Amino acid sequence: MEHLSNLEQPTTMDSYDFQKLTNDENLQGTESQVPSGSKSASTNGLLSAASSAAGSSFGLTPSAILQQKHENAQQGKKQNNSKSFSKKPAIDVHSEDAFPTLLSKTGPSKPRIVSWVRKTASNTSVAGSDSVSRDKIPFSASSRASSTKSTLSSVKETDFVTETLILSPDNQAPRMSFVGKPNSVAEIVRTVMHQTSTRINVSTASKTKNTTFLIQGKTSAVKAARRQILKLIGRRETKTMPCPVFVVGAIIGTNGQNLKSIMDRTSTRIQIPKRNNTANESSDDAKKPEKEENSAASTLDDLEPQYEMTTITIEGDFEGVELAQKDIEAIINERTSNTTVRISHISTELYSLLRGPDGKNIKELEEGRDLKVQIPFAYLDPSAPVNPIVLSGEKSAVRECALYLQGQAEELLRTTIPTMLPIPRRQHRFINGEKGVGIQDILRKSGCSVILPPINGDSDVVSVRGPALNISEGIRLTLERANSTIVDAVNITTAYASSKNPFDIASIVARLFLRSRKLIPLEEECAVQYHLPKREELQSNSNKTVIIEISGKSQEAVREGRAKLLALVNQFPESKFYKVTIDPLLQRYVIGSKGKNLQKLRNEHQVELLVGEYGEEDPDVIVCYIGADDGKSPDQIQKELADLAESVKSSAEASAKIVSEIIQVPSVYHKHIVGPKGTTLNAIIGKSEENVIVQLGKVSYRPDSTDDDVYIRGFSKDVERVVSEIKQVVRDAKNHEILHSHVEEFDFPAQYSKNVIGKNGSNVSSLREDLGVQINVEEGHIRIQGIKKNVEETAARIKSQIEALIDDTILRVNIPNDFHRQLIGSNGKYVRRLEEKFSVRVRFPREDDSSNSTGNELMKPTSPDEVVIRGGKKSVAAAKQELLELYEYEKSIAYTSTIDIPSKAVSRVVGRNGSTVENIRTQFDVKIDIGDVSTEETTPVSVRGAKADVENAIKEISAIAEEVKNLVEKVIKIDREYHRYLIGPNGSKLQNTIKECGGSTDKTETARLISFSNGNSEEERNSVVLRGDKEIVEALETRLLEIVEELKNQVEEKIEVPQRCISSIIGRMGSTRRDIERKTSTMLNIPNVLDPEETVTITIVGSPENCEKAKEMIQEKVASQYTQMITVPDTVYESIMKGILMKKLRSDLKVFVDTPEIKPVQPTEVVLEDHEDGVFPWKLVTHDYTGSSSSEWAVRGHKENVEKAIASLEKSIKQVMENCIAYLGIPTNLHRRIIGSGGSIINKIRKIAQVKIDVPRTPGDEIVVVQGSRAGVVKAKDLIFERLQENQNQE
């Protein structure tokens, strides 16, 4: 057994120690139990009587042998650690000297053949082999005294195993004696042997002091004995480890099962600090906060979530502590693998570009990854908080996606430019389109994003952002959508100007239009749309007008829609409305079940009631007369409406008596009335929630209320009950501890336990959250603890659920399988309708029922004809009756017809992957059976269903078969060199040719219609095969030959262009080049020349006249690239760029200005005049734009347009340099005098003086700013002062 202690064992445990076990006199006392002269020692080992006779027979006792082998093993380790690599002698595993046999009491027996194996080794020695090479039994590479090693030996004859446990002195519990004490090693090992039915031999090496335990027995018993030895003898230690708080519930498990399992398996004691009922929560409850905790990561630089931590303490032997630690770490790692990141540093202007058209980019990012990307929609509102991008999922995927989005954002900031467009707010909805389709369409077509201001804001500015080459197209599409609809607005408030409160009447009319949908017929008649104000706008105190917007495609339609709207508004004078106050709790009686009362009033009295328009607390009900006047006077109509309103109110009050009561409860007890998350109040109100209102403390609309008030209002009997229960709760709250100690337990049928708990504990968790109780469910028993009222409500709900489960019934109905399809209906619509109607579940047989063993076996049909129905007894019976009636009906209308079709047409009838026949089945709701295709010319097709549907399906099948009969095949000879010209880029020319000949452009149909041969012979390669309808084939043949003839007559033309113009000729992604080729029916060959100083020779292939057209288009592109430079002082850079001149040059002259990147230079301010004295102080200043630096701007476009643009730039530069600014100090209260009614005066001054005048709107700001030429500014100043002087003279 020399090698036994050296076998390497994979272990995750720390090293162990034991004190030396000596073979002293105490051991000799055990030898007397063995008869004298016996030649064997019991394999119970040292503790079960090591025989002196055996010692004389072999020279050494088993313990001495083991001790000697320990010493030899240590010597072997030293040799292994030396630098010599001499070959080790082989070990004879059957040697009696090396491995002495321990004989039984009955006499000697044959040596037992054992196989010493490593736990992780894949190669094991076979029992019965003569010897085992030392190389096959590796020694430990190092002599770690603290390591724990074990080997396993399986004995084939008895199914026993042998395991060796070696403990170093450091890993043994201190002050442990071998024998003689109750807690000695001998007593401990004897107890373990008795408990586990194993045999254990113990020895200690004299040099290393390592203690070896040789354990024999069944596998499970050996493992249990090993664990007990480590628990009782091994070194004790205590470890602490951090743990996220939200994972504690998962570690504990349901009713502590997980924690108990870990402690039992590892023989440890685990302590978890108490924290807000953490120890009582189940593992299912623990899963809920996991997502919240994982949402902690908020920035790109910190993707690791920051969890609230607690400390877990583990006590036990050193191996058990480490095993328990690993189990807990596995649970923690499992529940912290995901994370969530919020990215808020990316500009919201880039969100649409990052999202892509219709979220295309998001789908690509999420595809194939455990990742969820949420990029919100952005609005042009700098004051609004940033709505961040949210990434959720697996950590590495989230980090990768975050880095990618940041890179994309930086790239977009460099390669895109924003443009602000002032567009009236009323047109924003047309840019956005329904559900944002307009903005997505612009993004898809131009690559530019459009950002609108918030709906509730007052800004008119729309932002368009995209690449510089595409921004003009994005602006064009945006303006096109904005101007695609004509908009008009009608202020209906003016129709009620004579009323005391025109806004109230106009808002009632608007609400009536919203409720009664009276504008829909006008919209259909006039081809317009009416946009009514929102209810919030009609309720606003600041809004004093009701505006209805009209939009349409033509001015005439909008004008007609306006006239119709005004006519409709005039039909509803103020006399047709009457307001009555009805308690909100009574309003549901006014409405009636499903609105029956409102419908009755509408039919009998021609009135419409506007109920609860402004929320549940709105007591106002508006009675609107919508019938004809019939000659009645306004007073008569008002009287009739008043009588009807009082009748409605009296009827509602008669339906239920509303009372209110206020009880005084000290505010400190209000929290007990409400309960955790409102649970107690919910339990008190119960099913009377719609009939009772409970308000605690002071409220604004009851001025006399106090902090101690509890206000209850509702139906009298419900108010009486709620008051009584609130008083009881307050009484109970005085002793809070007793209140929460109420417990209710009851038994129920054990088979319903999983139904009470719910999937993943969902039912129990829901009750805990709603009613704030603790629930423990065991097999057939439930225990509920919490507030008495909550416990009673919880028990009532669970008992109700159990009663429903007990009532659960399963019925099996036999219906022929041929009718199942009709009973289920298209997409299961009939069976779903049956399930919803009777609240049952219906299960039809499936094809995989026989192979699929998962799922609910009770609901699985036992035969192909069996239908299973499950639910309440009465519901199941009713569902069965209706199902059988439906079966009888289907059986009575079943109709079958069979036709024969050509066998060659079968594949066309079936279609690719069965698509054609499936479409016919779905379209006509029939069943189609196609016979086996044999060598016969025809194949039978059987169609079953309703007679009309069968006949229609047969017509469809016959049409396909007839089409196949008309198919022909032709082979035409066309030289291979012309094939690519016939096909064109991506098959575009071929598609157009087929379309001209009446064929389909579907790619599948095209591939079937025409094929270009790739044969081996020259004749095959010059062949084109046409296969399809005779007329199309003949037309296609003629057209292809015509095209080939045209190709033979083609010529090559060359044109030279500067290399700098090549990009404009090719266009983005080759679009311009393809456009030229398509319009001129030519092909362009453009060589790759990189030197900008060289010219590029473009070859044009096509007919002579088409080549000339292509030349003209290329020359036009070259002409549009004319460039001229202009010198601009850096001091005017900012003024020119901020103006609208640059936009006008692009839009009007199609000219582009390339400006260098410079830092703007601010001009020097020069004061021309300064008059601080006088009634109105003023100052006139100008700016000195002359500076030492200037830059060259490049102007590109057509030559004549470039010259015009340069003239405009020079003129603008001159105006900027000559501009003056006047600052006029005018008191704020006089500003309206210079503005005039509707801005008439100030606009007149602007027009006369040709200047810009800015009047401040901020209170307290008195400075009026005038900008323009010096003469104009002085003129404007004089006119303003004259106007103010005239007003003073008049006063």
From Swiss-Prot:
Residues where Phosphoserine is found: 115, 934
Region (Disordered): 1-45, 70-91, 124-148, 266-303, 845-865
UniProt key word Cell cycle: no
GO biological process, one term: regulation of mRNA stability
Domain annotation KH: ranges: 166-229, 236-328, 339-405, 416-486, 575-644, 658-726, 741-798, 808-883, 894-957, 967-1040, 1050-1114, 1219-1280
Chain positions found as Phosphothreonine: 935
Subcellular location: Endoplasmic reticulum; Cytoplasm
Molecular function, one GO term: mRNA binding
Name of protein: Vigilin 1
Originating species: Schizosaccharomyces pombe (strain 972 / ATCC 24843)
Lineage: Eukaryota, Fungi, Dikarya, Ascomycota, Taphrinomycotina
